């Protein structure tokens, strides 16, 4: 049997789809092999050629299982450590999550085969990027969304990184799909022109890396200290460990008071209700002010509801030691808007909470803050804030960005995911936000990766994971507005709409030619 005939078998293509999907994980941190993104997408597009809609749909699902099964397996760490369920059930839950995310790649492959059954250039170079943009949007929106593992992030160190300040991560993903499609067309139809165009799309954006969309302000450079407490997740919400936790952060902070005007503690560094820590917060506020430093810290806010309706809890950031003396409730604060299902709130709460510890984790009853909130002000600087998972949401970060923003800030606690690849992927996505908006980004975490990122997405300084130490770094604020900061995703959606209309025209004309 020839290799060509062997590759026509559906089960062979399904297995290859799993392989090519898994290859895509190598494009992301900590591996950072950006060409793997093109290889993975090339595999998806080539394997769905000459397939019926049903066959292509299954291949798309298998490819998604390869990508998400390997790329988000870090979810298993938190489920197994804190979910309180048998190993078999933990594995099944991770498979179910990967299967759910694979529904979107399945939808992509099915629509592509249905609308464009022939291996034409417009199917591979135009229809594929358009449909991918649409299905990726759905993945980031349906059921609150999970826009993890977008291929554009793989280019943070790649040749297409210069696209980010123009069109954001979606624009990079769009071009990657077009390049992959052209390469498939070049191989399948033996058209050297398609390969040349693909190479041009890959290399022509390279000079864009040299454009500086921002203006540094070296005269305003400031020393910043970010404290990495390395508190074990098992101790995080233990009332018996509260005093020890606060003492760790205070002891690590003292040497930098008066030395660093801005000191940052990570997400829920103070693992208690804000009003219950009034004495401690007042003491820290006075201590900071006396030493001419200011502190940003994560904490839990509880707001009493009227008419005996209890409290609303918020995952918040507050500022201490700045211009105004601390007195609850301060106005200089940020409350997390995009909450993580099961981690910060539980859907169908009354039904699911009794079933297993996974659905009844500590502090999993948060409420949303406003979608758009004013920047934090500290030591004369404006910071656009995002807590943990929110830094993945490019549109939300952009919508909160202001022309007067000096720094981006994200605080996080990735202790849930242990020594897995999850924190590295999270870190990579944070770097993209700095590149898109042309601002330095300060990332303070409980156990890593704590880092300062430059306005071009470069790593200025970082400290190792799973260590208790402080990152001290001098960071220069920037001004200026990138095209992406000014226009957001609108240019990308206009491109998608125009090329989508062209795709529909070609599909309708192709069907009429048949008849």
From Swiss-Prot:
Gene Ontology molecular function, alphabetical: N-acyltransferase activity
GO biological process: lipoprotein biosynthetic process
Keyword Repeat listed: no
Alphabetical list of NCBIfam families matching this protein: lnt (TIGR00546)
Domain CN hydrolase: 227-477
One cellular-component annotation, GO: plasma membrane
EC number of the protein: 2.3.1.269
Active-site residues per Swiss-Prot or TrEMBL entry: 267, 336, 388
Natural source organism: Yersinia pestis
General function of this protein: Catalyzes the phospholipid dependent N-acylation of the N-terminal cysteine of apolipoprotein, the last step in lipoprotein maturation.
Protein localization: Cell inner membrane
Pathway this chain belongs to: Protein modification; lipoprotein biosynthesis (N-acyl transfer)
Protein name: Apolipoprotein N-acyltransferase
Positions of transmembrane segments: 14-34, 59-79, 91-111, 124-144, 163-183, 192-212, 488-508
CDD domains per record: ALP_N-acyl_transferase
Family: Belongs to the CN hydrolase family. Apolipoprotein N-acyltransferase subfamily.
Keywords from the UniProt entry: Acyltransferase, Cell inner membrane, Cell membrane, Membrane, Transferase, Transmembrane, Transmembrane helix
Recorded topology in the membrane: Multi-pass membrane protein
Taxonomic lineage: Bacteria, Pseudomonadati, Pseudomonadota, Gammaproteobacteria, Enterobacterales
Domain of life: Bacteria
Keyword DNA-binding on entry: no
